[in-house]
């Protein structure tokens, strides 16, 4: 769920900046780099923190923050102030940075050392599947809303409608990811007490 949301945000915001706000690709790219920069700063620190705090708790908090960002972007229109978009991007980067390393820590800590390569490969596969599904979902929703119309500024209202629909779907996916992390906490706590 988490990786579906991340890829969708980048592509959706790129469309929004270029076709709804009328920015060029260079300006869009400059602002889109905010989220990965925040993620790059957060992820290593979250990884260290997950050695002291239950990693699934951190992952759940990170996913909850990313869910708030997605919810903000669900209401994105042509008139949404840019600072609000930037706040959502910062929250998305912070949330995903807080989610990714602790999530990997939780996965790798839950398997015996001999199964670590399989667990790592499975996680990488799930990430790739999520990213691929996100672009498929984005294409499906845009095709549903816009039909065979091209992405162009004259169809800005349809692009906004498709973007809002995508964000609503991804908000639900993020909520499911938060609950999955919380269930994982309870399961691992129960497992640890039984050991």
Q: What residues fall within each predicted segment?
A:
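12-transmembrane solute porter fold
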Residues: 1-147, 159-188
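Short, Lys/Arg-enriched, Gly/Pro-containing loop segments at transmembrane-helix junctions
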Residues: 152-153, 188-195
């Amino acid at each position: 769920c988490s990786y579906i949301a991340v890829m969708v945000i980048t592509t959706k915001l790129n469309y929004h900046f270029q076709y709804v706000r009328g920015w060029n690709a260079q300006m869009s790219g400059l602002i889109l780099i905010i989220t990965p920069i925040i993620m790059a700063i957060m992820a290593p620190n979250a990884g260290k923190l997950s050695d002291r705090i239950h990693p699934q708790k951190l992952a759940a908090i990170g996913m909850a923050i990313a869910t708030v960002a997605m919810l903000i972007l669900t209401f994105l229109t042509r008139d949404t102030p840019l600072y609000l978009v930037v706040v959502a991007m910062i929250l998305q980067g912070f949330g995903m940075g807080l989610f990714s390393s602790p999530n990997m820590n939780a996965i790798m800590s839950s398997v015996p050392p001999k199964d670590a390569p399989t667990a790592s490969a499975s996680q990488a596969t799930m990430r790739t599947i999520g990213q691929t599904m996100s672009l498929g979902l984005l294409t499906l929703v845009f095709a549903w809303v816009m039909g065979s119309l091209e992405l162009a500024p004259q169809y800005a209202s349809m692009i906004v409608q498709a973007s809002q629909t995508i964000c609503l779907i991804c908000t639900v996916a993020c909520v499911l990811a938060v609950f999955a992390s919380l269930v994982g906490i309870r399961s691992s706590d129960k497992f640890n007490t039984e050991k």
